[in-house]
A protein has these predicted regions:
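Metal-dependent enolase-superfamily TIM-barrel catalytic cores that perform enediolate-based chemistry
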Residues: 165-282
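Polybasic, lysine-rich low-complexity intrinsically disordered segments
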Residues: 2-3, 12-13, 22
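Metal- or metallocofactor-binding catalytic centers and their adjacent structured scaffolds
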Residues: 44, 76-155
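Conserved, mostly hydrophobic/aromatic
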Residues: 42, 80, 144, 157, ...
Length: 413
């Protein structure tokens, strides 16, 4: 009997495969060594309420502002990386923000891995169930969440828009925001202001409305439209001016012929049904949610058809973590997002969000005087905001200016 023994697997191809398997095992071994590497543990949090006066007293449709309170935080990890976060508290109430960070939310983060963003968000939200879910406590949560994203993007060595997964890499579309009420400001002055933004390259601009009578507001809108021409998107911000749908329609009927891009915040934020009724009575898109907290509020807006455009603010709604959830939900309803205020944080979010349309851009620090507190400004080019390319948000606080308007307090273990 003849026995034939055949040997397999010793050719060139098999040798190559063995080398590849060894290389993979080596690579896995290297990756597994991360368990012994430094993990970014949150070591300390600094909090400050900065009280910054406006250069000129400025009016909206239903209130006048002379001072702004900003909530600032710095979250530092054991590897020496620092992330910053911030929010607008209001014309008062900075002390509430500081207390929320020091006593309620900050201690939740200390000693934790900064990468656990979803879990940390849930822990902070749970801790604030009795005191928060809206208002200043939710804004404090938002600021801390923003700081975590900034910290983690810096740790990864990526600008925030790339860390999030960018749609746009260099610039994002923006509209110039202004048109506030000032003593002695005429419709002609308003028109000149709007035209000046177009001269700077913006193809979309926004003005305030709702403070004056329907006839007077129509005159302001007419002057603005004639100044910018028919091809520039012209937005109108009511700042919750109207009390009911009947009153709103007295204005809207006069506005429709000038084709504004949207009507913003016609009613108070909690009057969702009136937003929905107005949306059914006019072809003009209704924009709202800049003071909206949490995904559940936004879902009700969407379910009732109360918003054609969401203006969700990451420094209000629950931070970048919650903003991303809300934007994704809006996309499933076919609704676009044009986030409110704070172009410094919203530019990278718009860059990473398919259904985000515009960044609201303030070209000076008269109204958004938060600009005085940061060490580097976003720039614009041909109506688009130029994204920072440095890791994280791409800027920090101007400590000299922060010291002028507030004082840091440290929260540590």
């Amino acid at each position: 009997m003849k026995i034939i023994v055949v040997f397999f697997g010793r050719g060139k191809n098999t040798s190559r495969a063995l080398r590849q398997r060894k290389a993979r095992r080596s690579s896995l071994s290297e990756h597994s060594s991360y368990q012994g590497a430094t993990v970014p543990i949150i070591e300390s949090i600094d909090v400050c309420a900065a009280v910054v006066p406006l250069d000129k007293v400025t009016s909206f449709s239903n209130r006048t502002v002379s001072t702004r309170h900003y909530g600032l935080v710095k979250v530092r990890s054991t590897d020496g990386v620092e992330g910053i976060g911030f929010c607008y508290v209001g014309s008062a109430g900075g002390a509430i923000f500081e207390a929320a960070v020091q006593s309620l939310l900050g201690p939740v983060l200390l000693g934790k891995d900064s990468h656990a963003v979803e879990g940390l968000w849930q822990s902070m939200y749970q801790e604030a169930l009795l005191q928060g879910r809206q208002g200043t406590v939710m804004r404090a949560l938002s600021a801390l969440d923003i700081a975590l994203w900034d910290l983690n993007a810096k740790t990864a060595g990526l600008p925030l828009h790339k860390f999030l997964g960018a749609m746009e890499l260099e610039t994002v579309p923006a509209y110039a925001s202004g048109g506030y009420y000032l003593d002695g400001k005429t419709p002609q002055h308003l028109g000149e202001e709007m035209a000046s933004y177009v001269d700077k390259g913006f193809r979309a601009v926004k003005m305030k409305t709702g403070r004056l009578s329907p006839r007077e507001e129509e005159a302001r809108l007419k002057a603005a439209r004639e100044a910018v021409g028919p091809d520039v998107e012209l937005m109108m911000d009511c700042n919750n001016a109207w009390q009911d749908v009947t009153q709103a329609m007295q204005y809207i009927r006069r506005f429709e012929q000038y084709e504004p891009y949207f009507i913003e915040e016609p009613f108070g934020p909690d009057d969702i049904d009136s937003h929905a009724k107005l949306a059914r009575l006019t072809h003009l898109p209704i924009a709202t949610a800049e003071i909206g907290y949490g995904r559940w509020y936004h879902k009700e807006l969407l379910d009732k058809g109360a918003a054609g455009i969401l203006q969700t603010d990451a420094a209000v709604c629950g931070g970048i973590t919650e903003w991303k959830r809300i934007a994704a939900t809006a996309a499933s309803y076919g609704v676009v997002v044009c986030p409110h205020w704070f172009h410094d944080v919203h530019a990278p979010l718009v860059a990473a969000t398919p259904n985000a349309r515009y960044v609201e851009f303030f070209w000076d620090d008269q109204v958004l005087n938060f600009r005085k507190l940061v060490d580097r400004q976003l720039t614009h080019k041909q109506g688009r905001v130029v994204l920072h390319q440095e890791p994280g948000l791409g800027f920090g606080f101007d400590e000299r200016m922060v010291e002028r308007y507030g004082k840091w307090t440290r929260v540590a273990r």
